[in-house]
Amino acid sequence: MVHCAGCKRPILDRFLLNVLDRAWHVKCVQCCECKCNLTEKCFSREGKLYCKNDFFRCFGTKCAGCAQGISPSDLVRRARSKVFHLNCFTCMMCNKQLSTGEELYIIDENKFVCKEDYLSNSSVAKENSLHSATTGSDPSLSPDSQDPSQDDAKDSESANVSDKEGGSNENDDQNLGAKRRGPRTTIKAKQLETLKAAFAATPKPTRHIREQLAQETGLNMRVIQVWFQNRRSKERRMKQLSALGARRHAFFRSPRRMRPLVDRLEPGELIPNGPFSFYGDYQSEYYGPGGNYDFFPQGPPSSQAQTPVDLPFVPSSGPSGTPLGGLDHPLPGHHPSSEAQRFTDILAHPPGDSPSPEPSLPGPLHSMSAEVFGPSPPFSSLSVNGGASYGNHLSHPPEMNEAAVW
């Protein structure tokens, strides 16, 4: 015996209906809401049968205005993600039914104000704010009230408009004459991506571009304008912080470690007690204390160093056995004298057993040394403690080269 799925009684009729793979009496297949018989088409939810209208009314899209279901045959209007009946899609101030493509302002996601009422209320609020003693509020919220050329001048004033729109009501009594701010606007991720892409292309968009963005994102033009102003202000702050950070990095960066001076010197440089000091090889009475200025009765020149270690380095042009090589050019402004001739006579005829590789010095050196030394003592009184090869005639020229350094 077959039982009905609706009334649970056995089916004794000649005809039966098969719905949801179950057997039904013909009279039991009816809408659970309006009790109308369902002969051609039916809808089911949780084991219950519905007609088309009741099913969409109960489980279909709800109208954001009246919170009632929307029938498939009803005409609707869509604003952002909300769907409205035609009769519910009206201005909250003048109750005018809004048409498709008409500019409007959305409040609390489900209330609308037409453009005419919004602009008229904004102008009234502007006049009240001009006559009010309280200052500091934005002059106007109209998208046409400001030109993009004036945006930068008012970036700092309107940078916090979107952040302060949902503020507390503590100052309402003090700002009765001032314009009231609208609700806080929440920008969704897709809308934010569109605004960022537009900002990357044009940081300061024109009114026409803002109108296009308003149509694409569904945001009103004032919100878009304030967003661009805040974005430009943020970019300027980030550039200032990055420039300040670069200057701080350049100022506080770690200094280079100083390398030892000896490692960078050439082998011929004169460093006291250094690895290549020539004075360590010629420890004689000539370099003893007070012996540096035997040829200078008046003392050393004031501009020269006081010790041999302070002498500048003179590259050697002679053989490697001499501490300092000979100079090939005289100092400018010096001329030969009678004392220079004495040097020439002595140095031009060295002894035959002299080991010096330089039998004579060039003439320009003698003219320079005569001017530098002044009156010269006899060469017979000079002796070098370096060995027997350095005779009384001063066949080796290191002393002459030493004097030439001064």
From Swiss-Prot:
Gene Ontology biological process terms in this record: anatomical structure formation involved in morphogenesis; anatomical structure morphogenesis; anterior/posterior axis specification; anterior/posterior pattern specification; branching involved in ureteric bud morphogenesis; cell differentiation; cell-cell signaling; cellular response to fibroblast growth factor stimulus
CDD domains: homeodomain, LIM1_Lhx1_Lhx5, LIM2_Lhx1_Lhx5
Region (Disordered), start-end ranges: 128-189, 294-372
Keyword Metal-binding among UniProt keywords: yes
One Gene Ontology molecular-function label: zinc ion binding
Compositional bias segments (type: Low complexity): 137-148, 315-327
Entries under InterPro entries matching the protein: HD, Homeobox_CS, Homeodomain-like_sf, Lhx1/5_LIM1, Lhx1/5_LIM2, LIM_Homeobox_TF, Znf_LIM
Subcellular location field: Nucleus
Coiled-coil stretches noted in the UniProt entry, renumbered to this chain: none
This protein's GO CC annotations: nucleus; protein-containing complex; transcription regulator complex
Tissue expression pattern: Expressed in epithelial structures of the embryonic metanephric kidneys including the ureteric bud and its derivatives, and coma-shaped and S-shaped bodies differentiating from the metanephric mesenchyme. In the adult brain, expressed in the adrenal medulla, Purkinje cells of the cerebellum, hypothalamus, midbrain and pons. Also expressed in the adult testis.
Keywords: Developmental protein, Differentiation, DNA-binding, Homeobox, LIM domain, Metal-binding, Neurogenesis, Nucleus, Phosphoprotein, Repeat, Transcription, Transcription regulation, Zinc
Start and end residues of each LIM zinc-binding domain: 4-54, 63-117
DNA-binding region: 180-239
Modified residues (Phosphoserine): S162
Assembly behavior: Interacts with LDB1 via the tandem LIM domains.
Written domain comment of the UniProt record: The LIM domains exert a negative regulatory function and disruption of the LIM domains produces an activated form. In addition, two activation domains and a negative regulatory domain exist C-terminally to the homeobox.
Role: Potential transcription factor. May play a role in early mesoderm formation and later in lateral mesoderm differentiation and neurogenesis.
Protein name: LIM/homeobox protein Lhx1
Taxon lineage: Eukaryota, Metazoa, Chordata, Craniata, Vertebrata
